[in-house]
Amino acid sequence: MKLKKVLAAAMISLLATTALVGCGSDKKSADTGKKVQIEYWHVAAESFGGATVKELVADFNKTHPNIEVVEKYNPDMYKGLTQNLQAAMASGKNPDVVQMGYSFLNYAAENFKYTDLNEAFKAAGDENFMKDNYLPNVLQLAQTEDGKQIGLPYSVSVPVLFYNPEIFEKAGLDPQNPPKTWEEVSKAAKQIKDKTGNMGFFMQEYADNWTQQALIESNGGQMLTKVDGKVKAGFDTPESAAAYQVVADMVKNGSALHATNEEGFQAYLSGKLGMVCTTIGKRANFEKGAKFKVMASPFPAFGNKPTKIPAGGNFLMVFSKDAEKQKAAIEFIKYLESPEALAKWSTGTGYLPPRKGVADDPKGFKKLADENLNIKMALQEMTKVTKWASFPGANGLQAEQLLIDARDIILSGKMSAQDALHQTAEKINKLL
């Protein structure tokens, strides 16, 4: 079954329903009876779930007197975290639990010594935890192509179009009928700029290519392809260039922003931006910070073409080198993945929970999921998801950065989308 079908099934079900192990394990620690301290690395900035991370860690520490979790925020999203992890492991200072982005799954599997979660849960006396609480298709999000379970899905998100209904009304647009295609987005952005003086559109510019993948593949392009069994850049096509050029043209005519996320998101929250295309994971931050009613609609399509949106977010990996730390890490993961904790995480961010039945659990976020139209819409979007492209090999991080650099070149008008993507594909293929 294809990923978009199995993930759709997973989300429908969600609504209805002391041995040392692992690749990086090389020693045991004596059971001294002392408090075990573990590090939890994440990418949740204060404006993106940071407060919820602190709340969850504090709750866990209160209820687990023999374990102390120390959380550490890593800037620059998953690329920044992965680079920091690489440096830490090279110096022998492994963190214990890490939020790894789905786009770095292949890189992490091939370049890091990680703990085998199946064996780790077995050692903790709960070998059926994953099988009992997650559909096989959801677990696949954190599996390599050869079926290795290198982590446990934690956060799931989709890209959506947030908009300001008050700006829409001032511009003569209907808030109940937001843009459904990129042609309509372009026209609406220009109309907002011309009639209100506000900027019309902004697409997130994190240190990744998540929304850009959605853009490219929804127009019939692809991020990666295989040639003679080898992975190659697949975005050097007319379809990919045309998709990217849509956003570049909006920036060129002055109706869209090319800016940092902080600038773009703040413009939206302050009522100076009509539309922002970003993760549903920003829902809670937007709804809390805006003085207007935050509304969201599905990721726009290219004409009648079906949209293809990568499942964003992260999965949890364990890198503990000490048996007691490893055991504590598994205990912490079980807490983070509990219905109660997932409810707090989803409520505090906007991420969709991966565990079966959380939305129907009275300890889960059933009430919020039933009442919040933005959440309902995001859950329905799960029928369209594809896998987030992950560059393989030792040069995966460099390849990812080259494509990020291409985004800046295109949106700044230094080069056309066609030329920039062509040159970038050539560079990436040499690396891969």
Could you tell me what each predicted segment is?
Residues 62-63, 68, 87, 91, ...:
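Extracytoplasmic/periplasmic substrate-recognition and gating elements
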Residues 59, 63-134, 170-172, 274-275, ...:
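Extracytoplasmic "Venus flytrap"/periplasmic binding protein-like
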Residues 310, 373-427:
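C-terminal capping/gating helix-and-loop segments adjacent to ligand/active sites or protein-protein/ligand interfaces
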